[in-house]
């Protein structure tokens, strides 16, 4: 199940999720909740937390549309990594950063 709060980004968030599920079928195996929140003080655009099969993505609530897409893609890659059991932080970030812009462009070009 995929839940995203915040009316402004619900449709876009669902579109990104559906796009990513076609590439990362593991995403359909877990519950994911996306929560827009002010992350200014944390100096990040987003992060992912895992509890059992529940994955919570907090994403900064004042991003441009493209930054929102890129950040959600990045964090959904982390959810897939959690499902795959990839725990090494350096490898996780290397993979997510290496794919986020390519996947963002693929998503934007399909629209």
Model-derived regions, located:
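Membrane-anchoring alpha-helices and their flanking helix-loop junctions
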Residues: 38-41, 82, 101
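Catalytic glutamate of the conserved HExxH
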Residues: 71, 75-79, 83
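Hydrophobic or amphipathic, alpha-helical segments that drive membrane association/targeting
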Residues: 2-8, 32-41
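Hydrophobic (often cysteine-bearing) scaffold residues that line and stabilize catalytic clefts
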Residues: 12, 69, 92
């Amino acid at each position: 199940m995929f839940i995203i709060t915040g009316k402004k980004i619900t449709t876009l968030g669902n579109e990104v999720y559906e796009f990513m599920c076609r590439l990362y079928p593991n995403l359909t195996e877990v519950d994911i909740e996306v929560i827009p929140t002010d992350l200014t003080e944390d100096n990040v655009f987003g992060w992912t937390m895992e509890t059992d099969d529940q994955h919570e993505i907090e994403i900064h609530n004042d991003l441009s549309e493209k930054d929102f897409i890129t950040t959600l893609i990045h964090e959904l890659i982390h959810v897939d990594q959690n499902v795959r059991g990839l725990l090494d932080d350096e490898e996780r970030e290397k993979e997510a950063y290496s794919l986020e812009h390519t996947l963002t462009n693929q998503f934007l070009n399909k629209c």
